[in-house]
Amino acid sequence: MCSLPLPVMAATESFNWTFNSTQGNLPTNSGYKNDNEQNYYLTINSGNVSSTNIFGTRIRRATDNAAVSSYVSHTSYESSAKYGYSSTVDTSTLYYMRGKKDDTSTTTTSLKAAGRVTY
């Protein structure tokens, strides 16, 4: 019997959200980080994110909702953009991303944002 090592893939969660105001936020599903790299990757590949309709994100620890990344404002599409964690993260803890329409958005148009985050 032959045994081959399996590649370790980091957890990736998709999102497809609509925000009608700057009130409230939405979470992705939780996932484990499968490597020791202290970065996460964000793709925003559809929606109407812009300089007037700003999408805000932050990574949180699922067990206590503690922030493990800085809040980041996004004004355009991104492809596997790399962001560092603000706290040390590990492979035995569940994490999720919380998103919202940023308070500094100047349009009342609903914000639509879709993509994926890799922990």
Model-derived features with residue positions:
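Noncatalytic modules at the cell exterior or secretory-pathway interfaces
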Residues: 39-42, 87-103
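Short, surface-exposed loop/turn motifs at beta-strand boundaries within globular domains
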Residues: 33-37, 52, 90
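N-terminal prepro-regions of secreted/extracellular proteins
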Residues: 1-33
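Edge beta-strands of jelly-roll/beta-sandwich modules across compartments, strongly enriched
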Residues: 53-55, 104-119
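Solvent-exposed serine/threonine-rich low-complexity stretches and specific carbohydrate-binding patches
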Residues: 66-80
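Short, surface-exposed beta-strand/strand-loop-strand elements in extracellular ectodomains
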Residues: 51-67
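Exposed aromatic-hydrophobic patches
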Residues: 29-30, 78-88
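Short solvent-exposed strand-capping/beta-turn motif centered on an Asx-Ser/Thr pair
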Residues: 45-49
